[in-house]
């Protein structure tokens, strides 16, 4: 698995999963626009953790999050520990002749934090930790607040546990502003943006080379330009070029270019259009004012085009 443009984060995570002491990056909040590779980074981190002997679970911020976190943790930890919680109880009692029956049955279900503590204790006995990743965070989900609050206590208890959460920038901001999880403001903040063109080019070349296939230099350059630094677009371009190439080791230029076109249309439909539809009328006016410039836009210029003051444009941007 090739992960382009995120070397520093990947290296720090890898060190953290193998370190005897706790590192800040084990509690991280990842933010970025659609298509910047948030989910891919979470997936890569999970693979890293498993290689280092951790148990990892993938979660989505939806109702039922707490129980899903526990059930998935038990399931993924099954190869490390036995999570069956059973106790003995008297099931029958007879008088003359006296008889007592003993059976095994499930105990009364304790609270979520208690069950998670038992799980973490048993993992610790085996030298293993637990990584929870939560994608598409929904800041107004009560269970997310409960989970992060309990996680803070796990950290204070010096348990071997990690939490990586990812979401769109405005959702991340709303979560961090929640007073009940203020400790997250001290978490590692990872902001994902575009990847440099040379990183994209190297990743494409390495991917095809490792698989014994080739694409011409000219088409690689076209692909890099079409990708524009977006990790998800890189996935789409690579996949479609590969598929259009059929079984040929040397992918013909025409087929590779068709793959680039298909990826571009898919990116517009899956990423750009939903992002645009979420914008407010003023958001769209702001963007239209920016589009008049070929390079970076000055806030003073945008304010003039919108008929607003410089201070308004500054506040709106922030």
Model-derived regions, located:
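Conserved catalytic segments around the Walker B and adjacent sensor/switch elements
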Residues: 46-64
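A short, basic N-terminal segment
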Residues: 1-26, 72-75, 82, 91
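C-terminal leucine-rich, beta-strand-based interaction scaffolds used for sensing/assembly
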Residues: 218, 265-318
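Conserved AAA+ ATPase "SRH/arginine-finger" region at the nucleotide-binding site
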Residues: 188-199
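Amphipathic alpha-helical "lid/sensor" segments that cap RecA-like P-loop NTPase cores
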Residues: 205-270
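Conserved Walker B catalytic segment
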Residues: 103-170, 177-180
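Active-site signature of alpha/beta-hydrolase-fold catalytic machinery across serine-
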Residues: 43-48, 236
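Walker A/P-loop nucleotide-binding motif
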Residues: 23-44
């Amino acid at each position: 698995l090739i992960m382009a443009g995120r070397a520093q984060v990947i290296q720090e995570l890898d060190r953290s999963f193998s370190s005897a002491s706790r590192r800040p990056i084990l509690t991280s909040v990842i933010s970025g626009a659609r298509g910047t590779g948030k989910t891919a980074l979470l997936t890569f981190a999970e693979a890293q953790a498993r290689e280092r002997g951790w148990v990892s679970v993938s979660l989505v911020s939806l109702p039922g999050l707490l129980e899903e976190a526990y059930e998935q943790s038990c399931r993924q930890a099954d190869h490390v520990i036995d999570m069956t919680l059973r106790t003995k109880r008297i099931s029958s009692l007879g008088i003359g002749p006296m008889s007592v029956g003993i059976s095994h049955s499930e105990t009364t279900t304790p609270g979520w934090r208690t069950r998670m503590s038992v799980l973490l204790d048993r993992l610790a006995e085996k030298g293993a930790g637990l990584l929870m990743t939560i994608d598409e965070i929904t800041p107004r989900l009560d269970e997310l607040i409960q989970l992060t609050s309990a996680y803070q206590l796990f950290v204070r208890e010096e348990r071997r546990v990690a939490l990586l959460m990812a979401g769109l920038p405005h959702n991340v901001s709303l979560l961090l502003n929640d007073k009940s999880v203020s400790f997250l403001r001290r978490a590692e903040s990872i902001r994902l943006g575009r990847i440099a063109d040379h990183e994209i080019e190297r990743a494409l070349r390495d991917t095809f080379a490792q698989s014994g296939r080739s694409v011409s230099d000219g088409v690689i350059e076209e692909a890099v330009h079409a990708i524009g630094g977006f990790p998800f677009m890189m996935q789409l371009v690579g996949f479609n070029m590969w598929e259009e190439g059929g079984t040929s080791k040397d992918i013909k230029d025409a087929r590779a270019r068709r793959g680039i076109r298909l990826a571009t249309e898919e990116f517009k439909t899956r990423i750009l259009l939903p992002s645009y539809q979420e914008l407010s009328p003023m958001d769209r006016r702001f963007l239209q004012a920016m589009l008049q410039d070929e390079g970076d836009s000055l806030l003073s210029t945008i304010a003039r085009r919108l008929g607003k003051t410089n201070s308004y444009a500054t506040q709106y941007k922030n």
